[in-house]
């Protein structure tokens, strides 16, 4: 059965309040990092997502006791399997994050080569190279990455060949239990990395510099237990702010933080929105204001996030003037544009740039979700289009948005989930 969304568009603004979930991109590495802990950990503000369920199942396969009642509880004292098998990994690229913690704590680990969204080339080389520099032996065989080390990993000075969130997390986690100090240069600076470091430090790790491009990790002999609340999802926050902006509405996002998405907020203000922020909330008001096209260049944090690019493509399409969007992070990340063009959007793609603007109106159509963030832009487009939009393959959306239809409905959208046998 393939699940789909039916969205009935309207010219009524999307307005109201929305409670933002914890960030998937912090919750996942934190759950994998819990493999390092020799005592139970409790992680709260974890979003309800398929990738989270898969990760909990994977931890159980390794021998951990995992339960969820509000918070997620992980007790890794009895981990006795060191392999993340293909049947779980194939749907989720994040599984590579099991490798570093397994080899750091147990001296061995293997992970099937990963799957996930279809956005360009995303190799695991940087993860592998980092672990090798910490003293692990890596072999690739039968579709598995196998890591091993005699004794403990050894601290090292590592310069990342390119900025990678995933590899920064792998190396940082593995280095927590290494002998000696690791200095990680050219590390990624994303808030989710800071959150993972905060979690590890609560368990007894000695990590400093997370959020800068040099992270220092003094290895410790063991990690204990602890409690941690996952940082807010900045991309979900931005998605709902854009929904209000393109529909001429007013929305308040709760349980989130302005410092997480300063680049996107600056662009929303440039686009004509009134943005206000406070302790744990952000509001955007577009009532009776004109939407103006903005120039976007995606870049690693603290630059404009690639995961907000599709939403701002839609914003530019509906705005006055012409906006150029340049995608520097991933190749093949304009797959949402042909789908939006089916709804009547105006855009031209030239290489890694998209030029959009001055779309009079969108008309409902059958569209297909291709990757996680692009799919959200199709759903929002459906909310402001004339007529009915059917969004197919919404399992992409479910991988990263916690109950998006309930949250949009609360803002006045007419959206329902249905399934039909293919």
From Swiss-Prot:
Cell membrane as UniProt keyword: no
Record-listed E.C. numbers: 2.5.1.7
Listed GO MF terms: UDP-N-acetylglucosamine 1-carboxyvinyltransferase activity
UniProt-annotated binding residues for phosphoenolpyruvate: 24-25
Keywords for the protein's UniProt record, in alphabetical order: Cell cycle, Cell division, Cell shape, Cell wall biogenesis/degradation, Cytoplasm, Peptidoglycan synthesis, Pyruvate, Transferase
Catalytic activity: phosphoenolpyruvate + UDP-N-acetyl-alpha-D-glucosamine = UDP-N-acetyl-3-O-(1-carboxyvinyl)-alpha-D-glucosamine + phosphate
Chain positions found as 2-(S-cysteinyl)pyruvic acid O-phosphothioketal: 117
GO BP term, example: regulation of cell shape
Signal sequence bounds: none
Entries under InterPro entries matching the protein: Enolpyruvate_Tfrase_dom, Enolpyruvate_Tfrase_sf, MurA_subfamily, RNA3'P_cycl/enolpyr_Trfase_a/b, UDP_GlcNAc_COvinyl_MurA
GO CC field: cytoplasm
Function: Cell wall formation. Adds enolpyruvyl to UDP-N-acetylglucosamine.
NCBIfam families: murA, PRK09369.1
Similarity field: Belongs to the EPSP synthase family. MurA subfamily.
Protein name: UDP-N-acetylglucosamine 1-carboxyvinyltransferase
Gene designation: murA
